[in-house]
Amino acid sequence: MANINENYLKLKAGYLFPEISKRVKTYSEKNPSAKIIRLGIGDVTLPIVPSVVDAMIAASKEMGTAGGFHGYGPEQGYSFLLKSIANNDYGSLGIKIDESEIFVSDGSKCDCGNIQEIFSTDAKIAVSDPVYPVYVDTNVMAGRTGEIGADGRYSNLIYMPATKENGFQPEIPKEKADIIYLCYPNNPTGTVTTKKALRAWVEYAKKNNSIILYDSAYEAFISEPGVPRSIYEVAGAKEVAIEFRSFSKTAGFTGLRCAYIVIPKELKGRTRGGEEVSINSLWSRRHTTKFNGVSYVTQKGAEACYSPQGKKEIQASIAYYMSNAAKIREGLKKAGYEVFGGVNAPYIWLKTSDNLSSWDFFDRLLDKAQVVGTPGSGFGPAGEGYFRLSAFGKKEDVEEAIARISFL
């Protein structure tokens, strides 16, 4: 009998979203006629926009011809998409990113989870609290986190509390962290950061030879001027940061799967002997060994997102979701809830009522209003007493959900 990776046994029982699904299923079986409105997991509800559909249809037909068939493509991504990403997502900000610094993948969740494989197993990890669970769980699996304590924290992780008191801006740790996870616009709190704050993180990373893993999957939802869209807007960030982007929420690709990671050539790591190593080269080796690339048809769809008509259609979808966010935010405020986020991000972070725990509030909403959200404690100990609602639902469902919650 083979031995197992015992680090998996250190994971908290049940990943957050499967636990939510389990509770909803139990409730539905007992209440089969109940209309449940789901504002929990951040899956989109609008269909793929016409420009993308048309591009994928054309690509599919192309694949049905002898001259247009594509088998295994370049693992890093087709040049047509890499060029579109570099020109539109970065060139528009005055940031120069080379095609060789972009790696197309099947999702930011995969990239955020896989990137840790190229770093030492004794690397010291820093995460905000609350935090997207994937950052923590993949490092638990790799053996970096130590044991979990009674307070829900792992002994070897550096936790950076993001609270109401500090504006949900995690403070820079006093100790040295090798790898720092940052997410803006933030999941789960829906808040954003400033260039001044990012400059401080870049300075810390340079001083401590740290690497910042910057998850910018929700960048397209930023509406206010002056809010940074990329960490590379900060001078020197290319020397210390990796950035993650996704088409999932931006263009509704949750079922198609397409994202990308940017690793600048300037970014270096070190061996135990002190030798500098290119992080871009390391990731390229890992990426091409374990991944065969995103399909040609999907990448043609992603390319269409950058066409003038594609941009217009996608902006309309984003406006739809952000209108939902405004409805949730204002509706909850009128109902007496303390709310955060929902302005530059599709998530609303609220304080639970009556000092209920996050899971007790989940059960109350499900039982009394048939509304499903996400317990804040599932994102970390500092999320206890908070709750996340997603703006990715249908307009009519969002309006009904807020009406139901208001009557509680």
From Swiss-Prot:
It catalyses: (2S,6S)-2,6-diaminopimelate + 2-oxoglutarate = (S)-2,3,4,5-tetrahydrodipicolinate + L-glutamate + H2O + H(+). Keywords: Aminotransferase, Pyridoxal phosphate, Transferase. SUPFAM superfamilies: PLP-dependent transferases. Its EC number is 2.6.1.83. The modification N6-(pyridoxal phosphate)lysine is found at residue 249. Gene3D superfamilies: Aspartate Aminotransferase, domain 1, Type I PLP-dependent aspartate aminotransferase-like (Major domain). Pathway: Amino-acid biosynthesis; L-lysine biosynthesis via DAP pathway; LL-2,6-diaminopimelate from (S)-tetrahydrodipicolinate (aminotransferase route): step 1/1. It is an enzyme of class 2 (transferase). Its cofactor is pyridoxal 5'-phosphate. This is LL-diaminopimelate aminotransferase. It comes from Leptospira borgpetersenii serovar Hardjo-bovis (strain L550).
